């Protein structure tokens, strides 16, 4: 039997990229899915997935809209079993060029939107003593990079609130976990649509040696949404091809062929 048969899920940021892949995999596994997104493309995506998918226009920073969507999904389907907080925005700016408004905007969507989503569905899931919330953080929420002051901060916040929510909701039968993707070929990280082969040529510095397709991350969300992960609470599931596992010293055994900046070459005696 499919792993999500009979479950009702809400997936935010589902118009394209990882969110669309998550929604599609959920339906393939038997779920009924409400796709939400601020982009109008969400309608087309839901239609392409099929009759088990419904689209909602949704700004995740709008608390009233959250209540409307959750109430409508419950009215139509009787419950919400799974919430995936996937909506997010990416901004490449360093500390000196990031304005307070820049920081607030990224934090509002990525962190506050996730908080509002959890807060909205939690009473319903607590009442049923059942539910799974999966928050999309990032490998940058564990090991950040330069020029991501706002983005990494927001993803660290998602990571932290996931832990707190897991502690508070776990005794009520509600599981809360986070996924930490990295190097996924989505429109957010590859807005110019560069060919996969071109992207892969720059990936010799971590174990996978390539970017991932969105479905590879989506499969991790299926696991955490399903009963297969029944004992996972506050789990951080990293899906990054080994991006933050460590680093290679090129020129020493165990490293793949490739060229990196001097900081990643073997230390000299």
What would you call each of these model-derived segments?
Residues 96, 143-149, 171, 209, ...:
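Active-site loop immediately N-terminal to the catalytic Tyr-X3-Lys motif
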Residues 178, 197-232, 239-241, 266-269:
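C-terminal helical subdomain
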Residues 3-34:
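Canonical Rossmann dinucleotide-binding motif of NAD(H)/NADP(H)-dependent dehydrogenases/reductases
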Residues 94-95, 102-104, 202:
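Substrate-binding pocket helix/loop in short-chain dehydrogenase/reductase
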Residues 123, 167-171, 230:
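Alpha-helical segment proximal to the catalytic Tyr-Lys
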Residues 138:
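Residue(s) in the substrate-gating loop at a strand-loop-helix junction
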Residues 118, 154, 162:
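Active-site helix of classical SDR
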């Amino acid at each position: 039997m499919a792993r999500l048969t009979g479950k009702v899920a809400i997936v935010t940021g589902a118009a394209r990229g990882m969110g669309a892949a998550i929604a599609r995999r959920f339906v393939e596994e038997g779920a009924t899915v409400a796709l939400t997104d601020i982009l109008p493309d969400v309608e087309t995506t839901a239609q392409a997935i099929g009759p088990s998918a419904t689209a909602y226009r949704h700004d995740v920073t709008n608390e009233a809209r959250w209540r409307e969507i959750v109430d409508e999904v419950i009215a139509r389907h009787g419950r919400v079993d799974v919430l995936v907080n996937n909506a997010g925005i990416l901004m490449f700016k360093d500390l000196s060029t990031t304005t307070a408004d820049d920081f607030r905007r990224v934090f509002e969507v990525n962190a506050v939107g996730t908080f509002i989503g959890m807060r909205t569905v939690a009473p319903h899931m607590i009442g049923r003593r059942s539910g799974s919330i999966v928050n999309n953080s990032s490998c940058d929420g564990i090991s950040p990079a330069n020029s991501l002051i706002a983005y990494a901060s927001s993803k660290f916040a998602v990571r932290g609130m996931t832990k707190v929510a897991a502690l508070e909701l776990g005794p009520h039968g509600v599981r809360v976990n986070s996924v930490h993707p990295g190097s996924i070929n989505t429109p957010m990280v590859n807005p110019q649509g560069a060919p996969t082969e071109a992207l892969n040529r720059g990936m010799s510095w971590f174990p996978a040696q390539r970017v991932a397709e969105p479905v590879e991350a989506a499969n991790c969300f299926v696991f955490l949404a399903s009963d297969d992960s029944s004992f996972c609470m506050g789990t951080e599931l990293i899906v990054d091809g080994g991006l933050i596992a460590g680093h290679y010293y090129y020129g020493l055994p165990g490293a793949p062929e490739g060229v990196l900046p001097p900081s990643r070459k073997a230390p000299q005696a």
